[in-house]
From Swiss-Prot:
S-adenosyl-L-methionine is among the record's keywords: no
EC number, as in UniProt: 4.6.1.17
Protein's gene: moaC
Entry keywords, A to Z: Lyase, Molybdenum cofactor biosynthesis
Record family assignment: Belongs to the MoaC family.
Listed name of the protein: Probable cyclic pyranopterin monophosphate synthase
Length: 156
């Protein structure tokens, strides 16, 4: 198996100039486990820092757009759409990020980065509610961040 980002032992950005611009879609998701009392505070908009879902949505969109600044070999590509879905459950929140582009390379890293930052923002917004008496987070857990769908030029 050839590693595309390594040549002669040196890390490099892959040349995609020969590729055609095609429609690209990637969907990533992740989950954050929270105390049920924290979930209630989010639903009732009683979190001191403000609207948790709105903040996570904005942070996630910003992260998608900044992905090439965070991941060294990630190409800067034209993002045409970013959409977040937040599914609030009794013990946590599932975050899904759909990213679209018309370009030479996929948008999986952008979708993964968006989900990751949205989840981290949720944690930051509710950390005062999640801490135990020692300042730890025994119930808070971010898990299963993954790409659930990738489409290139209409082909899954």
């Amino acid at each position: 198996m050839e590693l595309t980002h390594i040549e002669d032992g040196k890390v490099r950005m892959v040349d995609v100039s020969h590729k055609d611009d095609v429609d690209r879609i990637a969907v990533a998701e992740g989950y954050i486990r929270l105390r049920s009392s924290t979930i209630e505070a989010i639903i009732n908009k009683e979190v001191a820092k403000g609207n948790v879902i709105a903040a996570a949505n904005i942070a996630g969109v910003m992260a998608v757009k900044k992905t090439p600044e965070l991941i060294p070999m990630c190409h800067p590509i034209p993002i045409t759409s970013v959409k977040f879905d937040f599914d609030i459950e009794s013990v946590g929140i599932r975050v899904k990020c759909t990213v679209k582009s018309k370009g030479k390379t996929g948008v999986e890293m952008e979708a993964l980065t968006g989900v990751s930052v949205a989840l981290l923002t949720i944690w930051d917004m509710v950390k005062s509610l999640e801490k135990d008496e020692r300042g730890n987070y025994p119930k808070t857990l971010i898990e299963v961040i993954r790409v659930v769908e990738k489409v290139k030029g209409g082909k899954e």
